[in-house]
Amino acid sequence: MSALNLTVRVHPVVLFQVVDAFERRNADSHRVIGTLLGSVDKGVVEVTNCFCVPHKEHDDQVEAELSYALDMYDLNRKVNSNESVVGWWATGNEVTNHSSVIHEYYARECNNPVHLTVDTSLQGGRMGLRAYVCIQLGVPGGKTGCMFTPIPVELTSYEPETFGLKLLQKTVGVSPAQRPKTVPPMLDLAQISEASQKLQSLLDLILKYVDDVIAHKVTPDNAVGRQLLDLIHSVPHMTHEQFTQMFNANVRDLLMVITLSQLIKTQLQLNEKLTFLPTA
């Protein structure tokens, strides 16, 4: 498959690690680079992890601690053998003159490595994210070169990562002095209540869009219409009585789990107090 047909999907933990490495950089370092880890399947490069590689850039050369990169990769393989080298990342919003030299090293580590740039300067108030592949240029028997060509990049996340992002959003706009250092886990019923309120707000937003389209206040979008149609078809067909019975059964199961967990917690606390009682 051609490198130009690749699509890059980046998980949030990768961006967090890039920002953390940028904040911990040396005072004389203007750019931070590192290795991207993940998997490639059917033209999709899924980046699930990364680590920083110490390096120094001079006017005419680049010095990178390749032995450190190999050691970090070997350690990561012991923890997660499914993650392989898929490319490399760098902070900044552009490809520099030294990028081709670094990319040449990663081309020996994997096929069609991708280059991810993360704009940690937040130009325009956003963290710019771009992905590139290197395309060889030249004529047969002549001098060859390479050109970094942009490819599609998007953010994706697993379900646990989505929950973590939602918790982080609760601290947005809160001053550092008032920002809590820890976030206690929510009770199951509180999570259901919060999810129901969010679902209700999303339904209100959809209904407003449909009403505006019918009233010719908004130009209809065919892509949105197809997604709404798929959403309607995904709703299971059942009567009101069947839905009520299924919902009540799930609520009873949830309450039973909560009750058992509270009993176990009480028993553990009682056992702990009995353990530390002085013996006669």
Curated annotation (Swiss-Prot):
Domain of life assignment: Eukaryota
Alphabetical UniProt keywords: Cytoplasm, Initiation factor, Protein biosynthesis
Coiled coil (residue ranges): none
Any one of the GO BP annotations: positive regulation of peptidoglycan recognition protein signaling pathway
GO-annotated cellular components: eukaryotic 43S preinitiation complex; eukaryotic 48S preinitiation complex; eukaryotic translation initiation factor 3 complex, eIF3m
Principal place of residence: cytoplasm
Molecular-function GO term, any one: metal-dependent deubiquitinase activity
MPN domain boundaries: 8-138
Function: Component of the eukaryotic translation initiation factor 3 (eIF-3) complex, which is involved in protein synthesis of a specialized repertoire of mRNAs and, together with other initiation factors, stimulates binding of mRNA and methionyl-tRNAi to the 40S ribosome. The eIF-3 complex specifically targets and initiates translation of a subset of mRNAs involved in cell proliferation.
SUBUNIT field: Component of the eukaryotic translation initiation factor 3 (eIF-3) complex. The eIF-3 complex interacts with pix.
Family: Belongs to the eIF-3 subunit F family.
PANTHER family xref list: EUKARYOTIC TRANSLATION INITIATION FACTOR 3 SUBUNIT F, EUKARYOTIC TRANSLATION INITIATION FACTOR 3 SUBUNIT F-RELATED
Protein name (database record): Eukaryotic translation initiation factor 3 subunit F-1
Native organism taxonomy: Eukaryota, Metazoa, Ecdysozoa, Arthropoda, Hexapoda
